[in-house]
Amino acid sequence: TLASELGSSGVRVNAIAPGVVDTPLTSQIKDQPDWYAAYAAKSVFNRWASVDEMVGSVIYLASDASSYVTGTVLFVDGGWTAADGRFTPPLT
């Protein structure tokens, strides 16, 4: 993996795996109430994430607090993956 190849050079390789985040790119989905609700229901918090909620994870992985973390995917998906991970689109 890239993490194992670059680790000896002190490079850490990690990723953030966000759930559904309220951004301009997701506005088309958000504008359709059935679809918005279907995505929100997959989070254990029953809502979409804000961009601000992604920042802490990025800061952590970029900081010295994660100096021994590499080759990791950090799921910031409101529990979607832990609860189920599947998506059933609304019937419209």
Pin down the residues of each PLM region:
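Amphipathic alpha-helical segments that mediate coupling or scaffolding at interfaces
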Residues: 28-29, 42
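Short, conserved catalytic or interaction motifs in soluble domains
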Residues: 8, 18, 63
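Rossmann-like NAD(H)/NADP(H) cofactor-binding core
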Residues: 9, 14, 72
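Short, flexible catalytic-loop segment of classical short-chain dehydrogenase/reductase
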Residues: 17-28
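C-terminal tail/cap regions
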Residues: 66-69, 74-92
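Alpha-helical segment proximal to the catalytic Tyr-Lys
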Residues: 4-8, 67
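Active-site helix adjacent to the Tyr-X3-Lys
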Residues: 1
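C-terminal helical subdomain
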Residues: 15, 34-65, 69, 76-78
